[in-house]
């Protein structure tokens, strides 16, 4: 076991994380301040209200992610977006996955879900708009 087990069930990913000096460091005071500022802004009511109602959103999360409070935090954010009028939201929880679903044992499922979701959004954008025919002068 490692203090980094919250990241992924994949031992190789955790080992790489532990040995990477760009991942395994203590934030500076400025780093903590910037992270705190970002979290405050990201969770502000205005952020949700300003989000375009037609913006498609995809949330992927592990149901064993302590950072997302085991799904509770993700559900809270999704409900805030829905409450602000955002309509096209899809949420996928991966069973037993932890924080980094793209670096988890089931990462291929997550990549497939992203691909499917992107294709569905592109298909929706490509559908012809229903335009009213304009009379032409003769």
Question: Where are these predicted regions, by residue range?
Answer:
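Alpha/beta-hydrolase
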Residues: 1-60
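Short strand->helix junction
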Residues: 24, 66-67, 100-101
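Phosphate/oxyanion-binding active-site loops and adjacent basic polyanion-contact surfaces
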Residues: 28-31, 69-70, 110
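Alpha-helical elements of Rossmann-like donor-binding domains used by nucleotide-donor carbohydrate transfer enzymes
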Residues: 34-37, 75-76, 109, 113
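Conserved strand-to-loop "acid loop" that flanks and positions the catalytic carboxylate
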Residues: 59-67
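Conserved alpha/beta-hydrolase "acid-adjacent" motif
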Residues: 66-76
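Low-complexity, glycine/alanine/valine/leucine- and proline-rich hydrophobic stretches
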Residues: 79-83
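Catalytic active-site module of serine/aspartate enzymes centered on a nucleophile-bearing elbow/loop
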Residues: 84, 88-138
């Amino acid at each position: 076991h490692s203090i980094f087990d919250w990241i992924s069930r994949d031992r190789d990913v955790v080992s790489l994380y532990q040995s990477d000096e760009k991942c395994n460091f203590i934030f500076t005071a400025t780093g903590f301040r910037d992270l705190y500022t970002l979290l405050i802004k990201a969770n502000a009511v205005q952020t949700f209200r300003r989000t375009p109602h037609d913006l498609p959103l995809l949330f992927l999360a592990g149901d064993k992610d302590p950072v997302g409070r085991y799904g509770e935090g993700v559900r809270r954010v999704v409900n805030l977006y829905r409450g602000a009028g955002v309509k096209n939201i899809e949420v996928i929880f991966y069973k037993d996955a932890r924080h980094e679903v793209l670096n988890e044992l089931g990462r291929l499922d997550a990549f497939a879900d992203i691909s499917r979701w992107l294709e569905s959004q592109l298909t929706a954008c490509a559908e012809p708009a229903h335009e009213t025919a304009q009379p032409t002068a003769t």
